[in-house]
Amino acid sequence: MKDGPHIVRIAALIGDRARADILTALMGGQALTATELAGVAAVSKATASAHLTKLVEGKLLAVESQGRHRYFRLADEDVAALLESLMGVAYRAGALRLKSSPREPAMRKARVCYDHLAGNLGVMAFERFQQRRFLRHGDGGLQLTPAGERFVAGLGIDPAAHRGTRRPACRLCLDWSERRHHLAGSIGAAMLDRIYALGWAKRERDSRVVRFSASGERDFRDVLDR
């Protein structure tokens, strides 16, 4: 039987090396120009433009024009979750890049996945949410419990602002390096914003790495363990 959506087109779009590099570069949640993405993929501007057109037509990317420039980003969080899952499959299959980056340990510890925290610390936070019963599975998917709402409110996040919106407040995202889930959705994004605002961590320039200070990591762990 051949029921359901046809996945070949999407698989073919992701399966090209240059397009895969472009998609991976956008996993940090930032919008980039065609020129910047051409550099990332090590292709000419004309070739990058052709790839970007295909990715936009395939609904994997969205484009926004500002003046003379066009900025490309991942279409939505579903695309980011798909890419993160594929990275996990590639990692388990041993499909690794030949050159190990000095940033790899830092990437595995804490990084941006679209707009939320991933890596060891992201998974740790999600597991604390589960242990403290901050989450439950309802008819609309993963939701904050009353205890979870009180917790995020204590961090300075208004839970009411995340109810009834188009984007899910909470959702699972499979972490490629930890092979377990971290917290995505608008609450996951708001938590990462608060981590920055509280001065616990900063994002490295031109990287997905989220670098916690020693005191920031201690405070982050403490607030999750209270």
Language-model region placement:
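Short helix-coil-helix linker/hinge
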Residues: L13-R19, D76-E77, M107, G119
